[in-house]
Amino acid sequence: MWNALKRLPLFPPSPKEDKQLRKERLHWRNMCPSLTETVTALFIHEKPTKGFRALGTGRFMSAFVAVFFNMGLSQKTRPVQLFGYILPLFLKPFVCTVVTTDVYDKDGRFVESKFEEIFNKHARTHKDALTAKEIKQMLKTNREPYDFIGWLSDFIEWKILHTLAQDNGLLTEDAVRGVYDGSLFQQLEKKRSSSSSRGKKQKLP
């Protein structure tokens, strides 16, 4: 996320820019509300907390991640450098970013070959999936020197992703791809909603 913020243009799509880039930027801007339950151009802790709860994380973890997320991005996205105890995060000035593994080019376009490189380089046990140990090694390999906040951010992002999307301890290529196109979040939310519905039915006399 931190590397992605440094790399992606922090402006809304322009009518004059490349059509493909404009399409992708609009895609991410449209995906942000569904992930964080954003109602306006800004959201506070309560919104991402609900969003992570919808994905299946516990109450404590949802609250922790939401505060960490807002603390890291609030100052970067505010139009003016003002202190805000609720740490508001403004979506308008930037393209929504996802887990960073350098799969974008300098213009913010998704590069398929770079995505596949993740598994070609780091998937040792299974060619189309990553184990927790392989993810840890990947993060260590991709570290930027002295970027301690970035290390922590990347570790938390991948740890949560592995916890929520792993299948028998494996994070599949399809699951990781789902992060970039937004489909994984919808799948996790539907899965949790379905589980909740079944639980309620079982409790009925």
UniProtKB/Swiss-Prot annotation:
Where it sits in the cell: the answer is: Lipid droplet
Q: Name one Pfam family in it.
A: Caleosin
Placement of sequence motif Proline-knot: 79-88
> Which of UniProt's keywords are assigned here?
Lipid droplet, Phosphoprotein
Q: Does the UniProt entry include the keyword Phosphoprotein?
A: yes
Using the record's annotations, give every residue carrying the modification Phosphoserine. Answer: S183
Work out whether the entry's keyword set contains Cell membrane: no
According to the UniProt record, one GO cellular component term is:
lipid droplet
Where does the source fall among the domains of life?
A: Eukaryota
What does its UniProt record remark on the domains?
Transmembrane regions are predicted by sequence analysis tools, but these regions probably constitute hydrophobic domains associated to phospholipids.
Please report which protein family the annotation says this sequence is part of: Belongs to the caleosin family.
**Protein's UniProt name:** Probable inactive peroxygenase-like protein
Organism whose genome encodes this protein: Arabidopsis thaliana
